[in-house]
Amino acid sequence: MHQDRRGRRGKDDEKAAYHHGQVELLTPLVKAYGSDQAFRVCELAIQTYGGAGYLKDYPVEQYCRDSKIFSIYEGTNHIQAMDLVGRKLGQNGGKNTQAFLGDLGKFIAANSEHPVLGPP
């Protein structure tokens, strides 16, 4: 029984290391995409109001200011991008990046005939 737990623990440790590596790799991408999209949405909302979108009479001006700060918190998106390219892509000997690309390839292959996810 003791060996069984140790064997399972080894597999759990491998899974944990894999998932930790994916989180490390993808965090800068998720942060940048989310914060950039939030600002773009608010920017378009201001455009729909015309010049009045900048007035405090409408909440969209506050939303825009609030969304801009997302790209600054936890390191600006540009700093995160430099960290991704300079450090995280090659982290763990590039294994995290290779694992992600392998998973992405499997996903693409599995969904190649999907009406929405497949090729146009």
Residue ranges and their predicted role:
Residues 1-120:
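Flavin-dependent oxidoreductase catalytic core characteristic
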